[in-house]
Amino acid sequence: LREMHRQQQLRLIEQRISEIPADAPLIVAGDFNDWRQKADLSRSGLREVFVETHGKPARTFPARLPLLPLDRIYVRNLKVHNARVLTTRPWSHLADHVPLSVEIEL
């Protein structure tokens, strides 16, 4: 995707988030293809789990040697614990990105 398209998609996500009550628990997660680290949803009250727990986004691509932080887990009104990048087998061989994992407490 071009940067312009990514920004349009982020605006659409933010628009949907604005329709959800601000005090409702919310998780937004997935492949943002955000290698420039511009997918900031903090305006919507969301916190990025790995930035919060590890000080930086998780590296998830390519799966065999993760260098780029393309995937994100954002939360709102939730506590997070044990955020991990699953780099071992079988996880590292299931897709071109390694999966992210986090325990969430209501």
What are these regions (language model features)?
Residues 1-106:
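Active-site regions of metal-assisted phosphoester/phosphodiester hydrolases
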